[in-house]
Amino acid sequence: MIDDIKNVSVVIPVYNEEESLPVLIERTLAACRKIGKPWEIILVDDGSNDRSAELLTEAASDPEKHIIAVLLNRNYGQHSAIMAGFQQAVGDVVITLDADLQNPPEEIPRLVEYASQGYDVVGTVRANRQDSLFRKLASKTINMMIRRSTGKSMADYGCMLRAYRRHIVSAMLRCHERSTFIPILANTFARKTIEIDVLHAEREFGTSKYSFLKLINLMYDLLTCLTTTPLRILSLIGSVVALSGFLLALLLIGLRLFFGAEWAAEGVFTLFAVLFMFIGAQFVGMGLLGEYIGRIYTDVRARPRYFVQKTVSAATPLTTSLRDEEE
């Protein structure tokens, strides 16, 4: 066992979770106290519309809780909020956790234990998943797309309960693209990874923040920000369509020569049907190209991926605590 972990950071993105926050904070504090190492909890409010920011500020005002509240000025998305938390984290191992309590905070010591064995990334698989059939199917589709696009085989990319080594977090912070999917980005830099089963509970408070449209947007993000495979597939489809059109033209010319002009006149509707199919394929291709170009434009503008409006913490900084202990 390679236990070189001196301190641990826990990063939790929060968006409209005022109902679950009191329980979340209590359970996370209890789990962190079992680690046996200095720790900090970084709660990032991703532009919530409810009292989440107020509750986070109140919790961070208690120095005994070791909580840092990071308040973003608006909603930037889950992964950007986690990146904002990474920017504040100083732990040798950084744990990410959703605020909905579907993955229990009690798993945190277990993740730290696996990380202490030398793993760069400790991923998790939701055992006995308590989600709707639609969410399960969407998750399986996304996982399959990721495996095919990146070639990295992991069972559950959608579970955000994960542990990352310090050098992995530092590498991710050096990446400045606007569209980011953290589990995949982390695996890009990781040498040694592992996945473990964790419990998955039903959501007790509120509703899921991932609607049908947000899941569709997530799929587009994954397709366009992680790989150029869709463009290659589009080129292949274009080649097949062009070849099919050429062969169809030869067929129609032959039929006209053998059956006369009357048949050609009756085949106008067939030609229109084929033409509309080609036009539809072109629009799909143009939309995909537009998605890539739009992301290039967004990255070229080089605007920050998030803006921290306020940071609240009454606890002694983790690095200072360690320095005092060493002295």
UniProtKB/Swiss-Prot annotation:
The EC code for this enzyme is 2.4.2.53
Q: Which GO terms describe its molecular function?
A: phosphotransferase activity, for other substituted phosphate groups; undecaprenyl-phosphate 4-deoxy-4-formamido-L-arabinose transferase activity
Which UniProt keywords are present, listed alphabetically?
A: Antibiotic resistance, Cell inner membrane, Cell membrane, Glycosyltransferase, Lipid A biosynthesis, Lipid biosynthesis, Lipid metabolism, Lipopolysaccharide biosynthesis, Membrane, Transferase, Transmembrane, Transmembrane helix
- UniProt keyword Manganese, yes or no: no
A Gene Ontology annotation in the biological process aspect, one of them, is: lipopolysaccharide biosynthetic process
Compartments annotated for it: namely:
Cell inner membrane
Transmembrane helix listed as a keyword: yes
Recorded catalytic reaction(s): these are: UDP-4-deoxy-4-formamido-beta-L-arabinose + di-trans,octa-cis-undecaprenyl phosphate = 4-deoxy-4-formamido-alpha-L-arabinopyranosyl di-trans,octa-cis-undecaprenyl phosphate + UDP
Provide the Gene Ontology terms for cellular component. Answer: plasma membrane
This protein's membrane topology, according to the annotation, is:
Multi-pass membrane protein
The pathway where this protein functions is: Glycolipid biosynthesis; 4-amino-4-deoxy-alpha-L-arabinose undecaprenyl phosphate biosynthesis; 4-amino-4-deoxy-alpha-L-arabinose undecaprenyl phosphate from UDP-4-deoxy-4-formamido-beta-L-arabinose and undecaprenyl phosphate: step 1/2; Bacterial outer membrane biogenesis; lipopolysaccharide biosynthesis
TM spans (from-to): 233-253, 268-288
Q: What main location does UniProt list?
A: membrane
Q: Which SUPFAM superfamilies match?
A: Nucleotide-diphospho-sugar transferases
By its UniProt entry, which NCBIfam families does this protein fall under? PRK10714.1
The task this protein performs is described as: Catalyzes the transfer of 4-deoxy-4-formamido-L-arabinose from UDP to undecaprenyl phosphate. The modified arabinose is attached to lipid A and is required for resistance to polymyxin and cationic antimicrobial peptides.
Which family does the record assign?
Belongs to the glycosyltransferase 2 family.
Q: What is this protein called?
A: Undecaprenyl-phosphate 4-deoxy-4-formamido-L-arabinose transferase
Organism from which the protein derives = Pectobacterium atrosepticum (strain SCRI 1043 / ATCC BAA-672)
